[in-house]
């Protein structure tokens, strides 16, 4: 099986073209491949398929390192756009890619940066999904030894965003692993810890559902900016710089009724071949 290794700000992916080769995976095989000592190693596996809709260019299936399938990955989708250009699967500058729940328009800006229309953020708790009797801008979650005040939103996948004073001091792995599996999130959630630097700049650390803390997460950056704007902490209509451990993303949102836009890099590392 041929594959490519890529990363978006250190959030690393194995990308597989299933258009020109036949591939099959189960969760055990994905977990084996994701192992950084005995496999290839990756945060997520991205499988590029032919489109199921004539108005779409490519379909993408997304698997976490634990073998679970998810339906959104902002950093991964940028890498897929770069991948299909590198592999000459398209010559388009504007590429529409679908997942099982979402479709996104991506624009190749130059040899490094990709712009993504991430769609509208969803705050309705039923659609996130999040167990709550009513919509609120902020929710309280109780976990052992902590009371957490957070915002929740879907960017095609569920996100929980927690405002903190010093993000570098947060026990991300401890809190993230507890909150990811909180009973209020029936499909689990990505957990983000956001520090406001200014109205157009934040620092962010992310515990990704099924993967643990990662260097960067595009949909989490979008979720954090959406929550920040919703709370009046960040400005609308400008590019908000999101500082992640792996690098920076730039997110803009006009407000309710409008899509989020993300700009970030997508970096090719190498090609390889492995026997399954």
From Swiss-Prot:
The record marks 159, 208 as: Could be important to modulate the pK values of the two catalytic cysteine residues. The active site is at residues 73, 217. The record marks 270 as: Important for dimerization. Its main location: cytoplasm. It comes from the Bacteria. It is found in: Cytoplasm. It catalyses: (2S,6S)-2,6-diaminopimelate = meso-2,6-diaminopimelate. Substrate binds at residues 11, 44, 64, 74-75, 157, 190, 208-209, 218-219. Pfam families: DAP_epimerase. Pathway: Amino-acid biosynthesis; L-lysine biosynthesis via DAP pathway; DL-2,6-diaminopimelate from LL-2,6-diaminopimelate: step 1/1. GO terms for cellular component: cytosol. Keywords: Amino-acid biosynthesis, Cytoplasm, Isomerase, Lysine biosynthesis. Its EC number is 5.1.1.7. One of its GO terms (molecular function) is diaminopimelate epimerase activity. GO terms for biological process: lysine biosynthetic process via diaminopimelate. Catalyzes the stereoinversion of LL-2,6-diaminopimelate (L,L-DAP) to meso-diaminopimelate (meso-DAP), a precursor of L-lysine and an essential component of the bacterial peptidoglycan. Homodimer. NCBIfam families: DapF (TIGR00652). Belongs to the diaminopimelate epimerase family. HAMAP family: DAP_epimerase. This is Diaminopimelate epimerase. It comes from Blochmanniella floridana. The lineage of its organism: Bacteria, Pseudomonadati, Pseudomonadota, Gammaproteobacteria, Enterobacterales.
């Amino acid at each position: 099986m041929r594959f490519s290794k890529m990363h978006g700000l250190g959030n690393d992916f194995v990308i597989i073209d299933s258009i020109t080769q036949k591939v099959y995976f189960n969760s055990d095989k994905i977990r084996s491949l994701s192992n950084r000592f005995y496999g290839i190693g990756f945060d997520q596996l991205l499988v590029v398929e032919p489109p199921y809709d004539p108005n779409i260019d490519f379909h993408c299936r997304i698997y976490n390192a634990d073998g679970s399938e998810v339906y959104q990955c902002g950093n991964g989708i940028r890498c897929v756009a770069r991948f299909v250009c590198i592999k000459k699967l398209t010559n388009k500058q504007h590429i529409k890619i679908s997942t099982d729940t979402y479709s996104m328009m991506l624009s190749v800006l130059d040899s490094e940066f990709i712009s993504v229309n991430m769609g509208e953020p969803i705050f309705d708790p039923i659609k996130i999904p999040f167990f709550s009797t009513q919509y609120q801008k902020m929710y309280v979650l109780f976990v052992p030894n902590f009371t957490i005040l957070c915002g929740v939103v879907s960017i095609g996948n569920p996100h929980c965003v927690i405002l903190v004073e010093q993000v570098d001091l947060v026990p991300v792995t401890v809190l993230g692993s507890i909150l990811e599996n909180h009973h209020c999130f029936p499909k689990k959630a990505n957990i983000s810890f956001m520090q406001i630097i200014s109205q157009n700049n934040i620092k962010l650390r992310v515990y990704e559902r099924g993967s643990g803390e990662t260097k960067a997460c595009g949909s989490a950056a979008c979720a954090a900016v959406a929550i920040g704007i919703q709370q009046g902490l960040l400005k609308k209509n400008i590019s908000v710089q999101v500082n992640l451990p792996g690098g920076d993303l730039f997110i803009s949102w006009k407000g309710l009724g409008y899509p989020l836009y993300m700009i970030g890099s997508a970096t090719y590392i190498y090609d390889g071949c492995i026997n399954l």
